[in-house]
Amino acid sequence: MAITHLYGLIGFPLGHSFSKKYFTEKFGNLGLSQTHAYEQFPIPTIEEFKGIIAANPNLRGLNVTIPYKQAVMPLLDEIDLAAAQIGAVNTIKIAEDGYTRGYNTDYWGFRTTVEFWDKFKNFESLKACVLGQGGAAKAIIVALQDLGFEVIKVSRQASEETVSYEELPDLMEEIGLIVNTTPLGMFPKVDDKPPIPYELLNKQHYLYDIVYNPLETAFLSTGLENKVGGIYSGLEMLHGQADKAWEIWQKKLS
């Protein structure tokens, strides 16, 4: 039986991705393995995006990862309002005629994990700092603001909208949640971690890492060594955003 519904992932590199395994298992569990498949498309440049769609007329949806969550947006026919407001796309629905619409499911994946985190009710401070300023960070910042957090954006260089890592020591007493959206600590460079003042961490601080390979990154383990209030790995966020993407792919474009 032919594959009538192909889905996939674009990004570069893709060695760290869990999506192919996740969706292949999902298709098997749903009895769709004969007609549905998931492939990886490691494209060195975003200019290859249109070629992938043209070469795969059965392609019905794509996930988007580093470094293309923002770069892909001008190449889409339409962008969902929420994704446009966030400023990043990580899910694309493709109609039979090749029409593309971009969405952001990182928002839902992150927001739901924080809302259902058993430590959430213990937060002493609803001030969060977000490490990194890529596509995932944009969705996470909006989700945190919608949950009532005041957000401090942290980048390597200070600007009108961000503070630098060097400025963090003066802010640690105010902060409750620290979210790492950078790839630091991802396999194979598992000893890397963001340059925050770990010696100032204590039980009022909660650490969330969107990196999921390994499950306990150097960022999280160092937090535990300094007796933070709790840690959260990014795997459940991935599950949440993937399930939301599948929900979107099942709906017809209107």
Segment roles from a protein language model:
Residues 2-117, 222:
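Phosphate/diphosphate ligand-binding glycine-rich loop within oxidoreductases
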Residues 120-127, 201-203:
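Short helix-loop-beta connector
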Residues 12, 132-134:
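Glycine-rich Rossmann-fold phosphate-binding loop(s) that bind the pyrophosphate
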Residues 161-232, 236:
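Rossmann-like adenosine-cofactor binding region
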Residues 137-138, 216:
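N-terminal Rossmann-fold NAD(P) dinucleotide-binding loop
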Residues 112, 116, 228-253:
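Active-site capping/gating segments
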Residues 146-164:
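NAD(P)-binding Rossmann-fold cofactor-contacting core
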